[in-house]
Every structure is written in C-alpha cells, then in structure tokens.
C-alpha cells in the first residue's frame, strides 16, 4: 500500500496474494454484500446500500438478457449469477478460485450454468457471447493489465454484444471497518480476514472518463452512471452504440 501518493507497481506476486485472499475468504465473502460483521456500518448506511443495490440490479435487469448467452467474470459465490439465471440467461461463469466456484455450485445449479476455473489474467474465451458481466472485479485489475482486461471484454463479445460492469466507488463505508483504502493514486491495499490474516490486494478506483476511454480503446462504446454513494456502473456495446442504464 503506497503512502507517498505514487502509484503502486503490481506484479505477479501481488496477484497471487490477491487470489490467495479470495480463496481464504470464501466463508466470509457474502458478509460484504449483506453488510454484516465488520462491514456493518449502521442501519442508515445499510439501508442506503440496499437501496443502491436495488438500483444497480434494476439497471442490469433493463438489459433484458432472457435467452442470451452471457459470460460472467469473477462471479464469486454467485450473488449476481442468480439474477442472470433468473432473467433467463445461459451463464458461463469463470473464476480463478475453486472455493468460490464450490460456493456458487452450492447456491445454484442448472442446465443453463457452466462453471470454469481459470485465471482471468491469462484466460481466453472459447467463443463469443451476447453479453459480458463483471461485478466488482475491475477494481481488482491493476493498471498494468487493464488494457488487456478491456481487450478480453471485446474478444468475448459478438458484434453488438453488451458489457455490464459494476464496481465500488471510493468510500470508506464500503469496506470493512478495519480496512484502510489506498491513496487516491494508489492501487493496492491490505485486506484482513476475520482470523487476523492479512493479504495485499489490488484496489484501483477509476474515474468515469478513464473507464470510458479504456473501453473505447478496445472498441467498446460505454457510458457510466453512479449511485449516490456506493456504486459505479458502465454499460456499453461492442459495435459502438452506447447503452445507458435506465
């Protein structure tokens, strides 16, 4: 974690530590989303979180993915996978952590769900999809690899395919009470598990214009919308026609 304001350099060692963190965190993973344990910031904050989550889910629902072939990157325990399946999509979910895939498998199974264990920093899609969804992953992609990540989005889509990205805004209330966010120009932080173990992870907050520009470099025209406090959402199309959340 940088204390000087200079950007952190992220190498393979940091990425390996990040993966180890998510593998070890599986039993605590949902606490962040449900605002329990160390993530409970009080009734008012939880109510705002839930309202803003409902807004984001509404933006995803508006894409009308029924019958679509959807790629989900880094699904974790499946908190958003269930919505995609409920919408009638066929979902291929790719995650590097086998423990997360086991948790997802325990949450939901069915003929429209395929699970793939793979490193998303090296994985390449076997085919093109109608849509790519990545919920709370892009902030864990370092600057050194963000261009390649956007190219992965592009390579995964049919012409006219849709991208849906959601991630956290930089707010202290979003993370655990015992976590410290990186400097504004930094991209790594230390995360702590309930048992006291600590890990370095990437946490890179990107501005709206920066995100739109990175998508454009990969041939995706995107627009960005924010909720009041917690979430940044980008929606775009590969063929250059922007799709706004509604």
Q: PLM features: residue spans?
A:
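A short glycine-rich, Lys/Arg-flanked "PGG" loop and its adjoining helix->strand segment in the class I
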Residues: 147-159
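C-terminal alpha-helical "lid/dimerization" subdomain adjacent to the S-adenosyl-L-methionine
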Residues: 166-214
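Conserved Class I S-adenosyl-L-methionine
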Residues: 201-238
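A conserved beta-strand element that flanks and buttresses the S-adenosyl-L-methionine
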Residues: 133
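Conserved class I S-adenosyl-L-methionine
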Residues: 2-64
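Short catalytic micro-motifs in class I SAM-dependent methyltransferases
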Residues: 136-140
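Class I SAM-dependent methyltransferase SAM/SAH-binding core
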Residues: 69-122
């Amino acid at each position: 974690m940088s204390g000087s304001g200079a950007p952190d350099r992220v190498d393979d060692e940091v990425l390996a530590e990040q993966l180890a963190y998510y593998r070890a965190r599986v039993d605590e993973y949902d606490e962040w989303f449900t605002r329990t344990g160390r993530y409970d910031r009080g009734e008012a904050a939880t109510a705002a979180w839930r309202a803003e989550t409902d807004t984001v889910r509404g933006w995803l629902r508006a894409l009308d993915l029924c019958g679509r072939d959807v790629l989900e990157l880094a699904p974790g325990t499946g908190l958003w996978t269930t919505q995609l399946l409920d919408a009638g999509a066929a979902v291929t979910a790719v995650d590097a952590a086998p423990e997360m895939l086991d948790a997802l498998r325990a949450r939901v199974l069915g003929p429209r769900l395929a699970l793939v264990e793979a490193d998303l920093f090296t994985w390449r899609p076997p085919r093109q999809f109608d849509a790519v969804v990545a919920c709370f992953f892009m902030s864990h992609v370092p600057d050194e690899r963000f261009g390649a990540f956007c190219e992965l989005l592009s390579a995964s889509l049919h012409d006219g395919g849709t991208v849906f990205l959601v991630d956290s805004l930089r707010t202290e209330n979003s993370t655990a009470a015992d976590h410290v966010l990186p400097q504004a120009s930094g991209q790594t932080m230390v995360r702590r598990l309930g048992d006291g173990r600590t890990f370095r992870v990437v946490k890179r907050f990107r501005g709206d214009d920066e995100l739109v520009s990175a998508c454009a470099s990969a041939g995706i025209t995107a627009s960005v919308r924010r909720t009041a406090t917690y979430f940044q959402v980008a929606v775009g199309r590969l063929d250059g026609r922007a799709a706004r959340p509604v």
